[in-house]
Amino acid sequence: MTETTPKTAPWTVQKRTAVLVLADGTVIEGKGLGATGAVEAEVVFNTALTGYEEILTDPSYAGQIVTFTFPHIGNVGANAEDIEDLTPANRHGAVGAIFKADITAPSNFRAAEDLDSWLKHRGIIALAGIDTRALTALIRERGAQNAVIAHDPNGNFDLDALKARAANWCGLENLDLAKDVTIGQSLVWKELPWTLQDGYGEQDAPQYHVVALDFGVKRNILRLLTGLGAKVTVLPATATAEDVLAHNPDGVFLSNGPGDPAATGEYAVPTIGKLVETGIPLFGICLGHQMLALALGGRTEKMHQGHHGANHPVKDYTTGKVEIVSMNHGFAVDSDSLPENVEETHVSLFDGTNCGLRVVGKPVFSVQHHPEASPGPQDSHYLFRRFINLIRERKGQAPLPEREQAA
């Protein structure tokens, strides 16, 4: 046990009803919330102050337990509109959550239910009342941890069995989780970005056609594409290049998603490689970025602790500007492995890891971070306009301003 080993928070006096058991045998006790049961997953931490519902329903968090570093939780409740999972009935996203404080009563006009009830409905096991700073420090020092999170209202746990489950879990390396979170069949997405006056509108006159390969896509990504005039046809992760081209797209989008890019890439990389050669504009985010790098001849690697939060500084070499972005990934592209015809366009100012690339002479680019920013900043919304401008250029149309003009 090191100095950073988390212990039950000193102000917690309730009987333990949940435990987090790490692969090294460390046991952390607290109050159980949400669903009951036990599940193996990787423990990470997220530094965002807001947007817990969007975080927990992001399919990229499949196979993970999210530790929230901000102490307050539940303030705005939960609702059906803020879910990021494309198919909410399947409940793709994080399997567990860890909080410092107990859930507070919601105080927001959009709240439909409290967070505890929502966690139960989503099947997410939660643990509260622990020293999340100490757990975060442990992850920072030792790396993302394989673990089991368990919740029993009676507080009955077979710790030896839970320790064995945590120690024997395979982890995220070599796991293809995209096949678990992707849609079962194609669909056309028409929903527009949310506004205070109208909520979510519906697109009626698209100007372009984008095919999105769904490796775990977030709804807000699709909304931003429709908001720029694109009809979006979403295809399953296993779609072939021939499947994509049969829709006669003006552009192709490679979505975010969970798991190891090398594992999903077993079937996705050949498809991406063929699409790159067509000359059709192509844009990738997160897992899509990583698999594009693999298709171009690069390599990916597992990160020590990953990047998870809405306050990450990234430098855009194409403009010289620094952006504050939202990130959620545990694997990264090895920039030294990229071939000469591929330029690094973005880099993390936290650790220097690759955050973007483009192919010289082709309308192909991608980023590691999440420019749709839900939750998070909007510094990177221009990337969607950059993608649409590649489509417009191919059609002989004038480009849009990359950043919206102030009213």
Curated annotation (Swiss-Prot):
BP GO annotations: 'de novo' pyrimidine nucleobase biosynthetic process; 'de novo' UMP biosynthetic process; glutamine metabolic process; L-arginine biosynthetic process
EC number: 6.3.5.5
Enzyme class: ligase
Segments of this protein annotated with the region CPSase: 1-205
Catalysed reaction equations from the record: hydrogencarbonate + L-glutamine + 2 ATP + H2O = carbamoyl phosphate + L-glutamate + 2 ADP + phosphate + 2 H(+)
Disulfide bridge map: none
Domain Glutamine amidotransferase type-1 residue range list: 209-397
Self-association and partners: Composed of two chains; the small (or glutamine) chain promotes the hydrolysis of glutamine to ammonia, which is used by the large (or ammonia) chain to synthesize carbamoyl phosphate. Tetramer of heterodimers (alpha,beta)4.
Function statement: Small subunit of the glutamine-dependent carbamoyl phosphate synthetase (CPSase). CPSase catalyzes the formation of carbamoyl phosphate from the ammonia moiety of glutamine, carbonate, and phosphate donated by ATP, constituting the first step of 2 biosynthetic pathways, one leading to arginine and/or urea and the other to pyrimidine nucleotides. The small subunit (glutamine amidotransferase) binds and cleaves glutamine to supply the large subunit with the substrate ammonia.
PANTHER family: CARBAMOYL-PHOSPHATE SYNTHASE SMALL CHAIN (PTHR43418:SF7), MULTIFUNCTIONAL TRYPTOPHAN BIOSYNTHESIS PROTEIN-RELATED (PTHR43418)
Protein name: Carbamoyl phosphate synthase small chain
Species annotation: Brucella canis (strain ATCC 23365 / NCTC 10854 / RM-666)
